[in-house]
Amino acid sequence: MRGYHYQEDLRSLRPYIREYKPVLVGVDGGADAILEQGYTPDMIIGDMDSVSDQALRCGAEIVVHAYRNGKAPGTERLKREGIPHVVFPATGTSEDVAMLLADDKDAEMIVALGTHASLVEFLDKGRSGMASTFLTRLRVESKLVDAKGVSQLYQPRVSTWQTLLSP
């Protein structure tokens, strides 16, 4: 997702990403945000309406979020371009699907970047479908950390050679 301040939040996570090498999941246009910062997404989840061709061809696993009835308009584009993908029918938003998949794969921590985390952002979205987001947050709440929190709490490790070279 490309929520408020996503670029500066992603930049602030550089040391964390360098040290922990987390699985990077781009939700829709969030895949392009990951690429803009010099990283490659491991997985892209969404309806694929706002994902660039570059992102779709970066080697990430592509999961098309389909409607409950299985219809996924984004698959036409992927089929036409010959891009391998998986269709995942689910209610809720693509962001919800990403968090639930991470939870299902036993992620120890889900660092949310560019999501609609505050009450203002949540309400600003203005969709009735946001109820699923509330339920998803209840499900993953013990694992979910906002990127701003990680960047403020994370302290990079100092390696031995850095200590030896210090004046």
Model-derived features: positions:
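Glycine-rich anion-binding loop/nest that anchors nucleotide
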Residues: 1-5, 28, 110-116
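N-terminal glycine-/serine-/threonine-rich phosphate-binding loop
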Residues: 1-24, 31
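Short, electropositive, low-hydrophobicity segments enriched in small/polar residues
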Residues: 7, 50, 118
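Short acidic, glycine/serine/threonine-rich loops at helix termini
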Residues: 9-12, 36-39, 55-57, 122-125
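Short beta-strand scaffold positions
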Residues: 25-26, 46
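Acidic/Gly/His-enriched mid-domain segments of enzyme catalytic cores or analogous surface patches
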Residues: 33-111, 115
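C-terminal functional extensions of proteins
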Residues: 98-101, 109, 113-167
